[in-house]
Amino acid sequence: MELLVADSRLTRLVGLAGRRSLPRGRALVFPRCRSVHTFGMRFALDLVWLGGGEPVRIDRGVRPGRVRSCRAADSVVEANAGEAGAVVAELKRARPPARPGESPAP
């Protein structure tokens, strides 16, 4: 799973709106984001809400024309419907577990 970061104003504003699809195995991360909409979308999404880099909620199969938010989140990952599991696996792979007695990595 390739996680692409929406880190410019333009990519955050446009996101995936208007695209016919998102290539399988790719997802878009929106840092500092607690609410998203799927207006202008042409396909359903899985939303993986993150708090401190860890999944706090997953909304599966969010169809176009919807609004979702998660107060517990500080970021969200948008992926093709059905790919939330791959996103979570990639997040775990990218963040090794803390050693006993250490705090998890930020």
Language model features with spans:
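Compact, glycine-rich, soluble single-domain proteins
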Residues: 1-106
